[in-house]
Amino acid sequence: MTKPKIMILPDKYPCSISSILISSESMIATFNHKNILQFNHNHLDNHQRLLNNIFDEIHWTPKNLLDATQQFLQHLNIPEDIYTIYILVS
């Protein structure tokens, strides 16, 4: 199993996530605050705070940001071994 290629653009800290773009050979998916609110409305569960918070929180270090992104992928059952992940921050 290979680790996903993760790029943070621009590379600055502290930051908050503006959007996440996930790509593979067969698909591209983007997530932002509006997408997540719609996802939560359609899939109400105990973990919806995690999805909202990833875009609301300030991430102080690259490790915090990568940990939050990996939790996000796990929550959505996205296999992280075949993807390139672009994290756009502000």
Curated annotation (Swiss-Prot):
Keywords: Host cytoplasm, Viral RNA replication. Belongs to the orthopneumovirus M2-2 protein family. It holds the Pfam family Pneumo_M2. It comes from the Viruses. Mediates the regulatory switch from transcription to RNA replication. Acts late in infection by inhibiting viral transcription and up-regulating RNA replication. Inhibition of transcription by protein M2-2 requires phosphorylation of the phosphoprotein. One of its GO terms (cellular component) is host cell cytoplasm. This is Protein M2-2. The keyword Ubl conjugation does not apply. It is found in: Host cytoplasm. The lineage of its organism: Viruses, Riboviria, Orthornavirae, Negarnaviricota, Haploviricotina.
